[in-house]
Amino acid sequence: MHGILRVKLSEEQRKLKAEKERAKIEEYRGLVSRFQEARKRKDYSEGNLKLTTELLDWNPETYSVWNYRREILLNDVFPKISLNEKQDLLDNELKYVLSKMKVFPKVYWIFNHRRWCLENAPYPNWNYEMMITEKLLSADARNFHGWHYRRYVVSQIERAGNCSLAKKEMEYTTSAIATNFSNFSALHNRTKLIETILNLEADPNSQKALAKQILEQELDMIHQAVFTDPDDSSVWIYHRWLMGHCNPNSMTPLISMITIEERIQYLQKEIELIQELHEMEPENRWCCESLVNYEALCKTLEKQKPTEADIKRWTLLVDKMIKVDPQRRGRYRTLQEKINNLNK
């Protein structure tokens, strides 16, 4: 690895190292064999919890061991203890899981087991779990597992309190994006929150006004992002999600009460802005692709067929995309086929 000095080992040192590794492999294989035999026998005795701990200390990504651990708790441990004892046991289990999360913050099976513990705990502490998500995302703001887990925790708090945290969570994603625009997980979370916030508004007129306000705020934020870093794919994907709502068949809360004429105006404004960026960044494939897609969508909304000049301009943009991004040539050729079919 870079920055690490390689030390040349003598023959004797190599043999000693190989012997140690061989011993570790044999130990691990022995544990796996014991686990497989015990589970095959459906041996759910509490003593096998230690076996699962040893295996998970070796490799926390072994989902079948996590499953067996839960089977032991459900079949042998829980039936024998009181609610308070069960809570104490699961508190210790959560501490164990947290120790794994700190070292392996992106292993699905660890998060899955934590959720199971909380769902089986008599008195789950969701506020503490929210603090855990903040620490996870503070360490890595783009950790998809951390964002997914946060959505889960928020849903549990909302259900317990019969309330909505959507607006607060929107503020949280805004802070995360302000720190780093290139945060696809935060932007993805935003797509879910926007529709939730709009659905909270019961009055149709108020919902329409709020939809326009949110759309314009989101576009302003994205404009700043694309001009700051035009090659950031996460920002363009989010922009496409926003503008995709202008599709004539879109009935999502964000755009459903905005007229076709207003959708056309939004598209035209975005096209002008992207053309301006394209002049500064002529090799940017995101600009090229967005111009083709949005101009074609605009024609559809206007119920007009593209002119020969339109087709020629879009074809030149597709050719540019293939040139600057040849690895995705198949995708761009499919786009070209769609362009060719627009006049048929």
Swiss-Prot record:
Catalytic activity line of the entry: geranylgeranyl diphosphate + L-cysteinyl-[protein] = S-geranylgeranyl-L-cysteinyl-[protein] + diphosphate
GO annotation, cellular component aspect: cell division site; cytoplasm; cytosol; mitotic spindle pole body; nucleus; Rab-protein geranylgeranyltransferase complex
Alphabetical keyword list: Prenyltransferase, Repeat, Transferase
Enzyme Commission designation: 2.5.1.60
GO molecular function: Rab geranylgeranyltransferase activity; small GTPase binding
Xref: Pfam families: PPTA
InterPro entries for this protein: Prenyl_trans_a
GO BP, sorted A to Z: endoplasmic reticulum to Golgi vesicle-mediated transport; protein geranylgeranylation; protein localization to plasma membrane
Gene3D superfamilies, A to Z: Protein prenylyltransferase
Ranges: PFTA repeats: 44-78, 89-123, 125-159, 165-199, 214-248, 266-293
Record's keyword annotation contains Transferase: yes
Keyword Transferase tagged: yes
Protein family per UniProt: Belongs to the protein prenyltransferase subunit alpha family.
Purpose of the protein: Catalyzes the transfer of a geranyl-geranyl moiety from geranyl-geranyl pyrophosphate to proteins having the C-terminal-XCC or -XCXC, where both cysteines may become modified.
Entry-linked PANTHER family: GERANYLGERANYL TRANSFERASE TYPE-2 SUBUNIT ALPHA (PTHR11129:SF2), PROTEIN FARNESYLTRANSFERASE ALPHA SUBUNIT/RAB GERANYLGERANYL TRANSFERASE ALPHA SUBUNIT (PTHR11129)
Quaternary structure note: Heterodimer of an alpha and a beta subunit.
Protein name per the record: Geranylgeranyl transferase type-2 subunit alpha
Native species: Schizosaccharomyces pombe (strain 972 / ATCC 24843)
Gene, per the UniProt record: bet4
